[in-house]
Amino acid sequence: MDSKELKNHVDGFWEEHIVPALFEYIKIPNKSPSFDKDWKENGYMDKVLQLAKKWVEKHLPDKSELLIKESPGKTPLLLVDIPGTKTGNILMYGHLDKQPEMEGWNEDLGPWKPVMKNEKLYGRGGADDGYALFASLCAVKGLHQQGLETPRILIFIEFCEESGSPDLPHYMELCSDIIGKPDLVVCLDSGAGDYKRFWTTTSLRGLVGCSLSVSVLNEGVHSGGASGHVPSSFRIARQLLSRLEDEETGEIKIKELHTNIPDYRKSETEKFVKTLGEEVVHEFPWKDKTQPTTNSLTEGVLRRTWRPALSVVGANGLPPSENAGNVLRPYTKLQLSIRIPPMVDPDLAQKAVVKALSNKTPYDATVVVECEEAAAGWSAPKTSEWLSTAINKASLEYFNEQDCSMSEGGTIPFMAMLGEKYPNAQFIITGVLGPNSNAHGPNEFLHIPYAKKLTCCIASIINDFN
């Protein structure tokens, strides 16, 4: 393979074909079904599907096939089946649904407003992970352009990842013959510790998502006449959350949500911290003098990757401060996001959470806990020698730096599904979500130079597949 020719192809293809497509993609508010209950009627998902379909048809490799599956009541699935000229089966994964808008975007930016600034493309979903479909095809075409042989490649793009991938088990069964048995899974939906090297993700946390609703009255009443006698729904919610979490330390109290961290993952984390140093703290946009939960860099990374953690990500029943009258509110509803470590059974974890929140409720208040489908975490199998060599070779070629691996605190449900179904498969979990790229938050950006180099690395690794 001519590395320089590949780089020229990738750079040109990104500028001419991928960046313009991502501009159009970012404009479409294709929120995942969890954040848009009327997604079908609103039509944004179909608009993105048609954009992707039209683009793929234009750039489809010879003898390849574009397949779209759309079962009743399910989000669509887009597949690009590229026949191989050498043995092997590679599955390349990404998604085209998005997180909601989130507040706090800079004045000149917005979730549905694509803006290119300092070689970074701002807007929701470009980095997480709308680029994956386009970059995957770019990598394959770069190899074909040089007449190089590739194994069979299936590009697999879902539309409900940000909702926990509830439709994937259905499509995994429906498309089992098409998927076959992957030898290598390439996922472009993960992170990067910096923009200086090729990063691989070796583990992901799982997720228990649920809402906690506490009701004490049928309607709000004057707080002057009721407070102190009628219990506060917010205080009860606080009490219930304290069953899950030590509010002094943030430690999760429920044993079913913990696991023993393998020594090799601890060693891997120490190497990660040695590579990045204080950047593992500085990557976050701290307010004023706010401090992390621990001064130990290694322990801090383990807390966000291999330990459970609770986040309250939304609330109902609380009026905006400027419109808050002196009313004892009838209810408080909190949306909870509980990250669980790899190797924790998500169903057992969810049952333990529901039990803790529901048993013996204070004052016999009405407490309702509603859960989404729990998602399992994932820990990578041992990397084969050929893949380890290919990854490091690619990083040295296109970044002039050794590759590095890390655990991630986010969740990609499909990886756990694939790991369970295909235990002999090898995995490359990587992505462009580096420092300050802020997926899910305001000012999300795609680092274009890094994305180009990552695309080259993926092509190089595919070329070295054996």
State what each model feature region is.
Residues D2-G104, Y331, L348:
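N-terminal helical capping/dimerization or prosegment-like subdomains
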Residues T87-I157, K453:
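Active-site metal-coordination/substrate-binding segment of hydrolases
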Residues L96-K98, K120, F156-S165, L188-G193, ...:
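Acidic, glycine-rich active-site loops and adjacent beta-strand->loop/helix elements
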Residues A127-S203:
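Acidic/histidine-rich catalytic neighborhood of metal-dependent amide-processing enzymes
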Residues I178, G193, T202, G209, ...:
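Acidic-enriched catalytic cores of C-N bond-cleaving enzymes acting on peptides and small amides
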Residues F198-T202, S321-N326:
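Short beta-strand/turn micro-motifs at beta-sheet edges
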Residues S213-S215, G220-H222, A237, W306, ...:
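Zn-dependent metallopeptidase/amidohydrolase metal-coordination segment
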Residues I338-P342, V368-S384, E408:
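A short beta-alpha structural unit
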